[in-house]
Design a protein with these regions (language model features):
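Amphipathic alpha-helical scaffolding segments
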Residues: 1-8, 54-71, 173-184, 191-196, ...
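C-terminal leucine-rich, beta-strand-based interaction scaffolds used for sensing/assembly
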Residues: 11-12, 213, 270-526
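Alpha-helical repeat scaffolds in large eukaryotic proteins
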Residues: 46, 139, 143, 178, ...
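P-loop NTPase nucleotide-binding core
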Residues: 2-147, 189, 204-276, 328
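The catalytic "switch" region of P-loop NTPases
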Residues: 116-123, 130-158, 165-306, 353-390
Length: 526
């Protein structure tokens, strides 16, 4: 039994960003935006109580009836709502529906007002509806429910994709965080890295850890060898069971390409034998086998095929790595795979996703990330406040680093599985901006490592492994990282092909130069 009750608020599934509100004065925008957010969350909360059929005790029912007759009516008078009528409720559900209806009516008062003023060319009629706030409406309302015995005392408001809120709405949300009223009511806010507003409505800043605790989910998952893998395994297994599919083992449902794995295993055994004969680079029996068997296989494919496209991205474990610590990536690509199998199958039930389909969809999903989604970023750059030049530089940077990582994979370096770069000297403003844009758009993840001199720490930028198929890289680990100078990265964003040629030349002279291994960065190593 859970110790909390949560309500999920997906911002992407709302129409909060009312452009008509920009016609109002700044203070009016703030007040109406807070009202829209507050009433929407209240509506979702009561909808969830009804949806999940929460059973309330008789004592709680009496408590709620008394609350509606006195406290709730007083709250409604304060926010300007005058249509509430006393009703002799026969059941808790009837009472919850009444609460839901009131909150929904107040929400649409403001929403409809925004739509109407969009048609007013001259002068704007004043808003005459109710105005709810977090402090005087939403928080006391939720607090009352947290005091009941029939539901857990901790209520979590899960606000997803908060980066999609407009600037004023982010300030509203920041103000709620700033109040720090989280004894029983806790705000859990998820956002992409592009959430860039940390001011409240009154101009105060919110700071971590003073006002909130911040967790980078990608860092949590990608820094653990088992946590993310176990999470995906549990999610997939539950879904396979729920849909009553004949095969509920994720490893069997997403099988490896047998011919490929047999060839890699043959190379793996070769390196084990080399160790036993005292001819290995690594100090442990499985070091070389883990490091080189898959890169060597890809290298062999590259030598026999110009594109190297016969490498298969298949198998449950490899698909987990391709998702780069982001659950949505795994589930979305899996959905495409299942649809592809249904389209080409004569059977009523899908027993497994064939390696061919896994590989086909994985490559298409990777291409979509780099090509189609990048085109969207180009078209919306101005609207979202991005520099169009920086969008172009970011694309060049990805191409340049993808080419560099591919060259390292095909080299004789001691560590060929490289997905990360660190900057060995001080990056200039442009390089910093381009990397930050890449992090914000999900093409890079950010971490830290010890600097080259061993005197402190520096930022490490990890390329999203969803891009691995574009460059035919091994996604199953990223133990190595490459130090690059600011001047080299400047060449990468301006002329990626010249950068790749320059890096290949350096690799041919000294393959180990500025190439390092960090065991803490290994992901799901077997």
């Amino acid at each position: 039994e859970l110790s909390y009750f949560s309500t999920y608020i997906p911002i992407k599934a709302t129409d909060f960003d009312k452009v008509e509100l920009y016609r109002l004065k700044e203070q009016a925008q703030k007040v109406i935006n807070e009202h829209i957010l507050s009433t929407h969350i209240a509506v979702m909360f009561f909808s969830d109580l009804l949806k999940y059929k929460v059973e309330f005790s008789d004592d709680d029912f009496e408590t709620l009836k008394a609350f509606l007759k006195i406290e709730f009516k007083r709250m409604l008078r304060k926010v300007g709502y005058k249509n509430f009528q006393d009703i002799d409720f026969k059941s808790v559900d009837e009472l919850l529906v009444a609460l839901l209806d009131v909150c929904e009516e107040m929400h649409y008062e403001a929403s409809d007002y925004c739509d109407r003023i969009g048609f007013q060319n001259e002068g704007i009629s004043p808003y005459m509806g109710s105005l709810c706030s977090y402090l005087h409406f939403l928080h006391p309302l939720l607090t009352k429910f947290s005091q009941l015995h029939s539901i857990p005392s901790y209520l979590y408001i899960l606000i997803d994709d908060a980066d999609n809120l407009n600037t004023t709405q982010k300030q509203v949300l920041n103000s709620w965080v700033y109040y720090r009223l989280g004894t029983n009511i806790s705000l859990k806010i998820s956002t992409q890295m592009r959430y860039n507003v940390y001011l409240t409505l009154s101009g105060q800043t919110i700071d971590s850890p003073h006002d909130y605790s911040e967790v980078n989910i990608s860092n949590v998952y990608t820094s653990s060898k088992n946590k993310y893998k176990e999470l995906i395994h549990d999610i997939v297994q539950r879904r396979l069971v729920e849909f009553k599919l004949p095969n509920t083992n994720p490893n069997d449902f997403f099988p490896e390409y047998k011919k490929q794995e047999e060839a890699i295993n043959k190379i793996y055994k070769y390196y084990i034998k080399q160790f036993e004969e005292g001819k290995s680079r690594g100090s442990k029996k499985f070091d070389d086998a883990n490091r080189y068997s898959r890169p060597d296989y890809i290298k062999e494919l590259k030598s026999s095929s110009k594109q190297g496209s016969s490498y298969f991205y298949s198998g449950f474990n490899q698909l987990i790595h391709l998702s780069s610590g982001i659950v949505r990536y795994f589930l979305e690509s899996s959905t495409y795979m299942y649809s592809e199998m249904l389209k080409n199958s004569t059977k009523k039930e899908i027993e497994f996703i064939s390696p061919t389909v896994q590989n086909k969809v994985s490559r298409a999903y990777s291409n979509e990330f780099l090509f189609e989604e990048f085109e969207k970023h180009k078209k919306t750059a101005k609207l979202r406040g991005y520099s169009s030049d920086n969008i172009r530089y970011l694309r060049n940077l990805i191409d340049a680093l993808g080419g560099l990582f591919s060259a390292i994979l095909l080299s004789n370096a001691s560590e060929r599985r490289v997905f990360s770069v660190a900057i060995s000297n001080e990056p200039d403003e442009l390089i910093t901006e381009v990397f930050e844009l890449g992090v914000g758009l999900g093409y890079f993840q950010i971490s830290t490592i010890g600097n080259k001199e061993g005197t402190g720490r520096t930022r490490l930028y990890v390329m999203n492994r969803r891009l691995a198929p574009v460059f035919t890289l091994d996604p199953t680990s990223f133990a190595g990282y490459k130090f690059l100078r600011n001047e080299e990265l400047k060449l990468a964003i301006l002329d990626p092909q010249n950068f790749i040629r320059s890096m290949k030349k350096k690799l041919s002279l000294n393959v180990e130069e500025d190439l390092y291994v960090n065991d803490q960065l290994e992901l799901f190593e077997e």
